[in-house]
Amino acid sequence: MNYPWLDTYCLSKAGAEKDYKEEWAATRYMIRGKLFAMQGGDKEGRAILTLKLPPDQGRLLRENYPDIIPGYYMNKEHWNSVYLEGSVEDDVLQSMIDTSHRLILESLPKRMQKEILG
């Protein structure tokens, strides 16, 4: 994997929790049980990270980076997968993680957001 910082970065996000879903062979990063990132593999066994993005941002990134594809086994309008052996720059991937985390956090009730953010 080209992103050894990935696990630490995802877990540094406010309210982030991690588990492993054995049936999917995937590590999931969640906020109060709502997924914001999932690390697993595609059918060829290539490592991927799947993230939620606004549709327009996802389309633009997919047009500019061959290692970013529509979300693997996810809603392809809102989710995008990044090949972790690819060449997406660290700052681009970190921005994608930040956006995914923010979208999920903002989808939670305001009371819960306040608890998470302190």
Per-range role (PLM):
Residues M1-G118:
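Charge-dense, helix-prone N-terminal extensions
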